[in-house]
Amino acid sequence: MEEIKVHIGKTVALMNDNIDTDQIIPKSFLKRIERTGFGEFLFDSWRYLPNRKPNPDFPLNALDRQEATILITGENFGCGSSREHAAWALLDYRFRVIIAGSYSDIFYMNCTKNGVLPIVLPREAREKLAKIAAEENVTIDLPNQQVISSVGTYPFEIDATWKNKFINGLDDIAITFEHIDAIKAYEQKVDSI
């Protein structure tokens, strides 16, 4: 997993509440087994018109927002089915940070396990961040747990374990390898019985 200590990036806002995983990545695109290639289908039914041309009214299609790496959204983001593909699609599109009012528990875990930092902020803060000009950057300071912008600095909470994983770029396998000596010692002990 790629580490995130301080992330500086552009934002795009999609302030709808209850965006479910079917809207994030429609089930018709889940036939592949790789974790990559899903970004082009992110929010597919909203991003594209029936003729597959980009919907000019959808925020991700705005020319000044196409480099965004921070998604600002509503309440209960990632609700619905528990497909991990939703986190893969967000990351593959290039989102490293999602700022929402709340998340589905399973979706939150899928994000943390796949390198997408889910942050919870109150609606007022998100509404202010959503109005930031396209040319402005927002800073995510993970060690100090702050979202820093021209419209304010907002503290956020994150579990210490997840914070450590993001700061050090550790996934579950890397954490397991941190304990390899203990694992080998245990295996030798069991083998000798």
UniProtKB/Swiss-Prot annotation:
Q: Name one GO cellular component term.
A: 3-isopropylmalate dehydratase complex
- Entry's Gene Ontology molecular function annotations: 3-isopropylmalate dehydratase activity
Q: Which UniProt keywords apply?
A: Amino-acid biosynthesis, Branched-chain amino acid biosynthesis, Leucine biosynthesis, Lyase
What's the top EC group for this one?
lyase
Q: In which pathway does it act?
A: Amino-acid biosynthesis; L-leucine biosynthesis; L-leucine from 3-methyl-2-oxobutanoate: step 2/4
The organism's place on the tree of life at top rank? Bacteria
Enzyme Commission code:
4.2.1.33
Q: Which InterPro entries would you find in this protein's record?
A: 3-IsopropMal_deHydase_ssu, Aconitase/3IPM_dehydase_swvl, AconitaseA/IPMdHydase_ssu_swvl, IPMI_Swivel, LeuD
* CDD domains to which the protein is assigned, alphabetical: IPMI_Swivel
Q: Which reaction does it catalyse?
A: (2R,3S)-3-isopropylmalate = (2S)-2-isopropylmalate
On whether Secreted is a keyword of this UniProt record, the answer is: no
Record's family? Belongs to the LeuD family. LeuD type 1 subfamily.
Please explain the role this protein plays, according to its UniProt record. Catalyzes the isomerization between 2-isopropylmalate and 3-isopropylmalate, via the formation of 2-isopropylmaleate.
Query: How would you summarize the oligomeric state and partners of this protein?
Result: Heterodimer of LeuC and LeuD.
What name has this protein been given in UniProt? 3-isopropylmalate dehydratase small subunit
Lineage runs: Bacteria, Bacillati, Bacillota, Bacilli, Bacillales
